[in-house]
């Protein structure tokens, strides 16, 4: 099981991910696209890296907006896995 990060470690990580914010026990980013089709295309691009990491985001879709939430459920909060996957998603 991944080790849960401390608040200090989380803040240090967040400083490297300015588009992400901490919401409760997760990190969240909202992506905005031209239309629904582009939003769905982006969601489909999340599948392969999430499967490869065996770490799956919670995803909300609202027309041209995609909200991605990351947390490590079995650790009860944020771990390095969340920030690693956030970095991968930022590259897409």
Swiss-Prot record:
Q: What is this protein called?
A: Putative pterin-4-alpha-carbinolamine dehydratase
Q: What class of enzyme is it?
A: lyase
State its Enzyme Commission number(s): 4.2.1.96
UniProt-recorded Gene Ontology molecular function terms: 4-alpha-hydroxytetrahydrobiopterin dehydratase activity
UniProt family annotation: Belongs to the pterin-4-alpha-carbinolamine dehydratase family.
Is the keyword DNA-binding assigned to this protein? Answer: no
What chemistry does it catalyse, as a reaction equation?
(4aS,6R)-4a-hydroxy-L-erythro-5,6,7,8-tetrahydrobiopterin = (6R)-L-erythro-6,7-dihydrobiopterin + H2O
What is the annotated signal peptide range for this record?
Answer: none
Biological processes annotated in GO:
tetrahydrobiopterin biosynthetic process
Originating species? Picosynechococcus sp. (strain ATCC 27264 / PCC 7002 / PR-6) (Agmenellum quadruplicatum)
Instruction: Please provide the record's keywords in A-Z order.
Output: Lyase
Q: Which domain of life is it from?
A: Bacteria
Tell me if Ligase is a UniProt keyword of this record.
no
What is any Pfam family matched here?
Pterin_4a
CDD domains according to UniProt: PCD_DCoH
